[in-house]
């Protein structure tokens, strides 16, 4: 890995996974530069893609605050699309700190990844204390990163920033905290999910692991078939499909390359 000086130029791409926006680069700059770049481009995270000895590529994920994340569903789909197009692949494997993930690139409108974990650590919890109007009953689940799922009658009436920050730092989930998903059932097969993301410390337009968490919990709560299929809509208005098939769970949705050319600039001092 090369060293970086404060005035060194950089090259990267901008991607969006259903509204979840990222810088994708083939380098890892110093953490303060990651924060600067994310603020400059107003994105949710930084995706570093490097060669891998056990997969088609290796992915390291950083939140916009510079902290490293163990998983990002939408970011993973963006990387799957990038690697597939760069290498001319349809089936793609990506190495992460949580293991090697397998996916399939059909088109930019349809990028699928197998998100299956051996243990989702699903737990129903009654919170020790809540804010006025907030449900006491929530569901904890690990979809690569920890999430708390909260079912509400109308997500548009939820103060996502206030409630999200409260639950993200709630004493019941210390010391690491959680991402928070507010979920409304729209139809039998459709969920509306708004997510407060740890590491961004705000609501994002979409969160892949959050939509996955919401779908998995909903499948249990509403006693869906083992092989289920749900459509999940995020704040951005974009929809992903989450489905279970033969014991595996898949996340499928569109990816957008926001900037077709590489960007060139200078790192902040």
Swiss-Prot record:
Cysteines engaged in disulfide bonds, as pairs: none
The protein's Enzyme Commission number: 5.1.1.7
Location in or out of the cell: Cytoplasm
Gene3D superfamilies: Diaminopimelate Epimerase, Chain A, domain 1
Residue numbers annotated as active site: 72 (proton donor), 207 (proton acceptor)
Any Pfam family matching the protein: DAP_epimerase
Residue numbers marked as site, Could be important to modulate the pK values of the two catalytic cysteine residues: 147, 197
Stored InterPro entries: DAP_Epimerase (IPR053407), DAP_epimerase_AS (IPR018510), DAP_epimerase_DapF (IPR001653)
A single GO BP: lysine biosynthetic process via diaminopimelate
Keyword set includes Secreted: no
Pathway info: Amino-acid biosynthesis; L-lysine biosynthesis via DAP pathway; DL-2,6-diaminopimelate from LL-2,6-diaminopimelate: step 1/1
Keywords in alphabetical order: Amino-acid biosynthesis, Cytoplasm, Isomerase, Lysine biosynthesis
Main location: cytoplasm
The protein's enzyme class: isomerase
Keyword Thylakoid: no
Family: Belongs to the diaminopimelate epimerase family.
Subunit structure comment from the entry: Homodimer.
Purpose: Catalyzes the stereoinversion of LL-2,6-diaminopimelate (L,L-DAP) to meso-diaminopimelate (meso-DAP), a precursor of L-lysine and an essential component of the bacterial peptidoglycan.
UniProt-recorded name of the protein: Diaminopimelate epimerase
Organism in which the protein naturally occurs: Chlamydia muridarum (strain MoPn / Nigg)
């Amino acid at each position: 890995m090369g060293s970086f000086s404060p005035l060194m130029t950089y090259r990267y791409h901008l991607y969006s996974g259903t509204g979840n926006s990222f810088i994708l680069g083939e380098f890892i700059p110093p953490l303060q530069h990651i924060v600067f770049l994310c603020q400059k481009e107003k994105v949710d995270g930084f995706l570093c893609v490097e060669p891998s000895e056990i997969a088609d590529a290796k992915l390291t994920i950083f939140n916009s605050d510079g902290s490293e994340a163990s998983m990002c569903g939408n970011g993973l789909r963006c990387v799957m699309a990038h690697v597939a197009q760069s290498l001319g692949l349809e089936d793609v494997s990506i190495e992460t700190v949580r293991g090697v993930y397998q996916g399939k690139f059909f088109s930019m409108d349809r990028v699928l990844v197998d998100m299956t974990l051996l243990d989702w650590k699903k737990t129903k919890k009654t919170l020790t204390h809540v804010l006025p109007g907030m449900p006491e009953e929530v569901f904890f689940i690990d979809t690569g990163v920890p999430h708390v799922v909260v079912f509400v009658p109308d997500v548009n009436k939820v103060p996502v920033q206030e409630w999200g920050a409260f639950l993200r730092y709630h004493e019941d989930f210390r010391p690491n905290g959680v991402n928070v998903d507010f979920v409304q059932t729209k139809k039998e097969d459709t969920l509306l999910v708004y997510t407060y993301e740890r590491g961004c410390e705000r609501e994002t337009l979409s969160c892949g692991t959050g939509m996955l968490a919401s779908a998995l919990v909903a499948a249990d709560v509403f006693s869906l078939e083992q092989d289920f299929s749900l459509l999940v809509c995020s704040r951005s208005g974009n929809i992903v499909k989450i489905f279970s098939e033969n014991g595996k769970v898949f996340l499928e949705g569109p990816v957008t390359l926001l900037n077709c050319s590489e960007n060139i600039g200078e790192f902040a001092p």
